[in-house]
């Protein structure tokens, strides 16, 4: 059964997509079969793998709304050993579309469970918010990997994210854990990075 890792931080510009892309590529280079799922409406992971996001007929948005199957939105082998469920700006409407939907926190999990065994790793790139999309990713995932920029104010957001992970664990996904923290944009020449790292 494939290990599912959600790459999440509600703060934007901290390197979530870069982390998701590079983690997927490194695992693929080691011979692992990887599925990248882009659930960020910005679609940076989609673009990062060379997919033209504005020309897609089926994306994770259509998958979440039940308008297509996983197989219909899956793009296989965008690079060797990496397939992707892409995203684009249409996904921004998902929050509104999901209002009133029963068990909406489990939509992504229910779809991904069908193909989980086909991959060694599934990497989910989350949007820069603690939205229903991020909750879906955490409900689906085994662990959460947190990219954090090496600056003082990043720590404020980290405590909020940990609180959200704990809530999801209590109410939706009892096995969810934090995989770890990845320091991004670290510069040893800047004095604030070292105290933040400690």
Where do the PLM segments sit?
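P-loop NTP-binding core
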Residues: 1-198
